[in-house]
Amino acid sequence: MPTITLENVSKYYKNRRGNRSGRRYETGVEGVSLEIKQGEFVFITGSNGAGKSTLLDLISGRIKPDRGRVLLDGVSIAHPLPWQRERIALMFGRVVEEHTLIRKMTVEDNLMIAARVGRKRFETPQEMRDRIKKVLGLVGLSGMEGRYPVEMSLGECRCIELARAMINSPPVLVLDELTANLDDDSIWDIFHLLTEINRRGTTVIMSTHASQYVNIMRRRVVTIVDGQILGDVQKGRYGDVI
């Protein structure tokens, strides 16, 4: 059961024009230490630019830290050995803030690409189609295989992106602003869906600004301010700082 550990992690970005202090870099996160165990549901909260996306990118191995270590069961996510890379890649299902479905391809084709890129060993094309059918059922969109993203609502597209993240059965979902710009009903539907996914044992790590829903759900809440963790509260409320 994978445990994710961050040990004194920092990430900086070059700033060609400098900032008010004259420094040539900006802080993404600085001195972050965190442990997330399998089966947890963790909200990452904070204002725009606080470092939420950077933290999620570090956790999922999308970027490498400049200092510190990011570990999955003691194995470096940023610097794995060659034989560890595929295992680590299959551990994470990722949804980024930007919408990334290929608009001119069907839902089924979008999910097939993710399945192949993820390198999960589907024995036959039919096995892959059966998996696609299953994950679409999990997100409440059965029968949508032949639809195109342009024919669907924003909420439906976000659920398809979630299904795509789940196609290879990862034990960890890393979700960046999955509910951004959705109406209240769609937000609640997604949180209800994530609760069920988490109940089945999947770790959910999610950044969000949907404060009222975070307050209702009362899960673990990690609050980031200026790249540093200022709050980490079990059964917390949005923005809790301790």
Language-model features: where?
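Conserved ABC ATPase signature
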Residues: Y148-M152, E156
